[in-house]
């Protein structure tokens, strides 16, 4: 049985990040993630609160992890014991953020000079070093394989292959929801048996989501750039996902 985290001492917290608190459970191979309403942007230089965000992100993540599992993508998802809580398999995380881009937006627009909203001929995969102190810098394959030696060539190829598979599945699903999957960030790790699994979350916090009808933004960019109607956008994503995936 999983204890209610509210009854645990602070010392029981395994890790607290910007969006989630990770607690141990009686099973050392399983952790409990409590999703927070806290919001951050620009590497935590901007902070705030989005009411209901924790429950939205946990529920959307649960639906999408289940979709991916059914499609043959191993993930760390186990169950959703409460609206803002998910049970995950404990992973040894790879210190890379894997970003998949279908449409030019954000930093890609700044780096290339291409107009935001430009549709790419095919999805591209980028890798960033997961290090807040360094600002999560963009890496190329040479940096990863020869400097950081974070993963080997076969592992890097598997990360890229898996990310593109996830993109194909989620893009098709979101299209059915009337949403365009612009870009998104993934994190991976290895379970106790050494199997690569998709970790972290899949939510409006780490996915750029625009409506198909009018490219209306439904993600954290609304908070990031003070666009207003942030809570409504998150709730709309949740409603569209549940309408397609089921309660």
Curated annotation (Swiss-Prot):
It comes from the Bacteria. Its EC number is 6.3.2.6. One of its GO terms (molecular function) is phosphoribosylaminoimidazolesuccinocarboxamide synthase activity. Keywords: ATP-binding, Ligase, Nucleotide-binding, Purine biosynthesis. It catalyses: 5-amino-1-(5-phospho-D-ribosyl)imidazole-4-carboxylate + L-aspartate + ATP = (2S)-2-[5-amino-1-(5-phospho-beta-D-ribosyl)imidazole-4-carboxamido]succinate + ADP + phosphate + 2 H(+). SUPFAM superfamilies: SAICAR synthase-like. GO terms for biological process: 'de novo' IMP biosynthetic process; cobalamin biosynthetic process. InterPro entries: SAICAR_synt/ADE2_N, SAICAR_synt_PurC, SAICAR_synth, SAICAR_synthetase, SAICAR_synthetase_CS. Pathway: Purine metabolism; IMP biosynthesis via de novo pathway; 5-amino-1-(5-phospho-D-ribosyl)imidazole-4-carboxamide from 5-amino-1-(5-phospho-D-ribosyl)imidazole-4-carboxylate: step 1/2. Pfam families: SAICAR_synt. NCBIfam families: purC. HAMAP family: SAICAR_synth. Belongs to the SAICAR synthetase family. This is Phosphoribosylaminoimidazole-succinocarboxamide synthase. It comes from Gloeobacter violaceus (strain ATCC 29082 / PCC 7421). The gene is purC.
């Amino acid at each position: 049985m999983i204890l209610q985290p509210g009854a645990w001492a602070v010392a029981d917290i395994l890790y607290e990040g910007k969006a989630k608190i990770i607690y141990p459970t009686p099973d050392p191979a399983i952790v409990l993630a409590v999703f927070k309403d806290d919001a951050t942007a620009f590497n935590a230089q901007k902070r705030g609160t989005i009411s209901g965000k924790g429950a939205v992100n946990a529920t959307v993540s649960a639906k999408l992890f289940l979709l991916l599992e059914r499609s043959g993508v191993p993930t760390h998802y186990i169950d959703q014991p409460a609206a803002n809580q998910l049970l995950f398999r404990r992973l040894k995380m790879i210190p890379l953020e894997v970003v998949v881009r279908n449409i030019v937006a954000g930093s890609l627009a700044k780096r290339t000079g291409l107009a935001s909203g430009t549709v790419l001929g095919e999805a591209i995969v980028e890798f960033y070093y997961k290090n807040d102190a360094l600002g999560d810098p963009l890496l190329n394959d040479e940096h990863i394989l020869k400097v950081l030696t974070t993963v080997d060539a076969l592992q890097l190829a598997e990360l890229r292959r898996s990310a593109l598979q996830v993109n194909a599945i989620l893009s098709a699903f979101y299209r059915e929801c009337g949403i365009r999957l612009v870009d998104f960030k993934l994190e991976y790790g290895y379970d106790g048996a050494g199997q690569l699994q998709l970790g972290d979350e899949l939510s409006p916090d780490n996915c750029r989501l625009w409506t198909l009808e009018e490219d209306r933004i439904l993600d954290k960019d609304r908070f990031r750039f003070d666009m207003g109607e942030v809570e409504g956008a998150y709730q709309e994503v949740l409603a569209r996902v549940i309408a397609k995936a089921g309660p």
